[in-house]
């Protein structure tokens, strides 16, 4: 395909798209897939014959005969949530990098609202937080007051309840390449859930029932015979799932931004907010969102979804906010995040060198110090100085001193 920008190595410029079996695309995907995991034996073995392996992958993708390798599964506790994560082999990560970076992301990007900040180059959680601050300040500038409300929306088990049939219909609007759609369907099919334990009546209505992958882990494996599969659920940690996660609620975002004309609206994966001067308007907006979400097969968590006054203290993406009557936006870190960080520091200090521990702490501190009080900053810096004495280098030097 023609590269109008003549930038052979710049895949994120999106001046063109390459086929998923393009040799250059696979090589660049290989470099991205192994980044940060070169130390793993599996990756090192692949590197020894990577040209032969990439050639094989290229041929199998072109002939549509590629088969995914078995994945690993583990449970991750993060930010107070327990999630089931699946790890992919290096070959599968390369293939999914090519699919997402060369086809899905460029195809979907133009249909996303600007304030959708997840899993996109140049965006992220920091981008979404900055946009929220911008929206709050613009709201105050327009209304000269903090009298207003914010609707905070959360979905129940978002990735667990993404329906495969709806996702494929959505993607077919943006992607027309035969090979890409074949690979996407193959990827989605891997996420099907064995529900052989269900009765015929339960199986008939399973797509309309909230699915929880954590509870699913407790089911007796002997009941999972492979006779019935549910076309719902995506694996967290899968790059395709991340792209699907930002594209799946496009109908909701278009409803809020275009149909309802809400200017101060943003999204980060399954967390979103809408700011308006009328509480009644936000209540009606929520009803519309719940209806559209239901048609997509996802469920709004009404226990966590709430409407708050802008002048009250409310939390979004683990930070507490409040808009004062002078237009100042107060930000405070979630105390639970500080507690988790202190525990992590105590656990890692004996396992890291002093430089590694310092880099780890400073990178975290730089991102959070502005939303911490002086008391909180002093406390965590005191702990850091104390723990530096028990890092790996410090302990080894003490042992050498005692030995001499």
Regions found by a protein language model. Name each.
Residues 141-269, 273-288, 373:
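Conserved polymerase palm-domain catalytic core
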Residues 3, 13-16, 103-163:
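Active-site-proximal segment of RNA-dependent polymerases
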Residues 175, 290-298:
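A common structural junction motif
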């Amino acid at each position: 395909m023609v590269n109008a920008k003549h930038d052979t190595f710049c895949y994120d410029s999106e001046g063109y798209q390459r086929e998923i079996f393009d040799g250059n695309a696979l090589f660049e995907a290989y470099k991205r897939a192994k980044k940060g995991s070169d130390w793993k034996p599996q990756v090192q073995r692949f590197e020894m014959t990577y040209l032969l392996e990439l050639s094989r992958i290229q041929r199998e993708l072109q002939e549509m005969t590629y088969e995914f390798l078995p994945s690993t599964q583990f449970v991750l506790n993060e930010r107070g949530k327990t999630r089931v994560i699946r790890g992919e082999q290096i070959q599968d990560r390369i293939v999914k990098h090519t699919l997402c970076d060369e086809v899905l992301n460029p195809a979907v990007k133009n249909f996303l609202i600007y304030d959708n900040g997840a899993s996109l180059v140049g965006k992220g959680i920091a981008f979404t937080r900055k946009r929220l601050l911008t929206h709050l300040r613009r709201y105050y500038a327009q209304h000269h007051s903090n009298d207003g409300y914010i609707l905070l929306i959360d979905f129940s088990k978002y990735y667990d309840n993404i329906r495969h049939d709806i996702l494929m219909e959505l993607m077919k609007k943006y992607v027309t390449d035969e090979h890409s759609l074949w690979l996407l369907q193959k990827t989605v099919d891997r996420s099907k859930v064995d529900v052989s334990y269900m009765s015929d009546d339960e199986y008939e209505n399973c797509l309309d029932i909230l699915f929880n992958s954590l509870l699913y882990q407790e089911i007796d494996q002997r009941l999972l015979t492979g006779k019935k599969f549910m076309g719902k659920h995506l694996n967290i940690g899968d790059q395709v799932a991340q792209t699907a996660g930002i594209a799946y609620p496009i109908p909701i975002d278009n409803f809020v931004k275009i149909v309802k004309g809400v200017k101060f609206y943003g999204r980060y994966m399954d967390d979103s907010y809408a700011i308006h001067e009328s509480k009644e308007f936000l209540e009606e907006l929520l009803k519309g969102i719940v209806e559209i979400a239901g048609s997509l097969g996802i469920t709004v968590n009404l226990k966590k979804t709430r409407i708050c006054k802008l002048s009250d203290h409310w939390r979004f993406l683990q930070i507490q906010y409040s808009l004062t009557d002078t237009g100042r936006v107060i930000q405070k870190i979630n105390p639970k995040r500080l507690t988790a960080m202190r525990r992590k520091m105590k656990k890692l200090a004996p396992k890291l060198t002093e430089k590694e521990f310092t880099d780890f702490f400073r990178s975290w501190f730089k991102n959070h110090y502005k939303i911490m009080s002086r008391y909180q900053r002093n406390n965590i810096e005191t702990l850091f100085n104390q723990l530096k004495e028990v890092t790996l280098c410090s302990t080894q030097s003490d042992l050498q001193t005692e030995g001499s």
